[in-house]
């Protein structure tokens, strides 16, 4: 289901890719494991995906763009649950052994085969509209902070607070359907520092020197995440003279923002002079990443993104799927930042942190 045009490796990955890059962070199995027997880790993660089936089924049932949505949603739940059971019995079935990317891909495949293209569209539209109305307030609160380092920390907290809006997490989907998400309250209620990975001071030191000329940001969710988290941060980078490329999914997957949706949101936020609350956006570009999942394998990105990223000196991978469950340990030829909130207990345990802990992993490349 990826982009029809040929996919290429992300140019900031060191070559050869096969020796230097592995997308998935958490190993579900080791070479010594029996290939015919599911490992405890595989079973645990298959169960994480199984637990999300009811919330996906519920979204699919109410998709008004699909005829017979309730019956098809039931079929989705049965088919995907069947695939997960098959993988427990034989980890080599369905293109296995399973990892986070395969389990996501199989779920999307079943949804799309049944005609479900974008089951989270309604909630994405609602959350985008809410976040757009809050954008000026969030930016003016940030702009009022005079100290560069403190303003950066405030913007980073905004990214974490926005990143809570993740309907791929079964637990958060339940919280969300019960009482929604309050962005400003979330900013105040982050787990206290130090976070499970906390390189904020090192990043701040480099930030204050205005050292980056071009940043590529792999974005994550719709709503507060992109609009109140990433865009104020990107606007600050623009204000400091950097060029910014926002890399978004080509096709819908859970409540992640797509390239088309992001273009539309930016056109609503910009004024008649093309400014984002007083900041020129001529150096802000939106790129189609070529991806269609909530995780990302950077050995396969669109040619458009590869072309725009070849001279980047900062790569930011945001969100639990792209920046923690995949790519946390990815090395790049330039400086990199992985930033996201831990929203699965299994990830928290792997990292030795707490649920809803924050990851801020900065790697500086010595020139």
From Swiss-Prot:
EC number from the UniProt entry = 3.1.3.-
This protein's cofactor list reads: Mn(2+); Ni(2+)
GO BP: coenzyme A biosynthetic process
Question: What regulates the activity here?
Answer: Activity is strongly promoted by Co(2+), Ni(2+), Mg(2+), Cu(2+) and Mn(2+). Activity is inhibited by EDTA.
Record motif Subfamily II EGMGR motif, residues: 318-322
Tell me what the record says results from residue 256 to A: Abolishes catalytic activity
Record text on cofactor binding: Phosphatase activity is strongly promoted by several divalent cations but it is suggested that Mn(2+) and possibly Ni(2+) represent biologically relevant metal ion cofactors for damage-control phosphatases.
Which annotated residues bind Mn(2+)? Answer: 220-221, 256
Going by the UniProt record, its keywords in alphabetical order are: Acetylation, Hydrolase, Manganese, Metal-binding, Nickel
Query: Which positions bear N-acetylmethionine?
Result: 1
GO MF terms listed in the record are: ATP binding; hydrolase activity; metal ion binding
Instruction: Give the matching InterPro entries.
Output: ARMT-1-like_metal-bd_sf, ARMT1-like_metal-bd, At2g17340, At2g17340_3_helix_bundle, Type_II_PanK
Q: Which superkingdom heads the taxonomic lineage of this protein's source?
A: Eukaryota
One Gene Ontology term, aspect cellular component: cytosol
Query: Quick one: effect of changing residue 220 to A?
Result: Abolishes catalytic activity
Q: What is known of its domains?
A: Subfamily II proteins have an EGMGR motif about 50 residues from the C-terminus. This motif lies near the metal-binding residues in the putative substrate-binding cleft 2. Subfamily II proteins occur only in eukaryotes, in two forms: as a stand-alone unit in plants, and as a C-terminal domain of pantothenate kinases in plants, animals, and chytrid fungi.
Report the protein's function. Metal-dependent phosphatase with probable damage-control functions. Shows phosphatase activity against several substrates, including sugar phosphates and p-nitrophenyl phosphate(pNPP). Prefers sugar phosphate substrates, including the extremely potent glycating agents ribose-5-phosphate and erythrose-4-phosphate.
| Similarity comment text for this entry | Belongs to the damage-control phosphatase family. Phosphopantetheine phosphatase II subfamily.
Quaternary structure annotation from Swiss-Prot or TrEMBL: Multimer.
Question: What is this protein identified as?
Answer: Damage-control phosphatase At2g17340
- What organism does the UniProt record list as the source? Arabidopsis thaliana
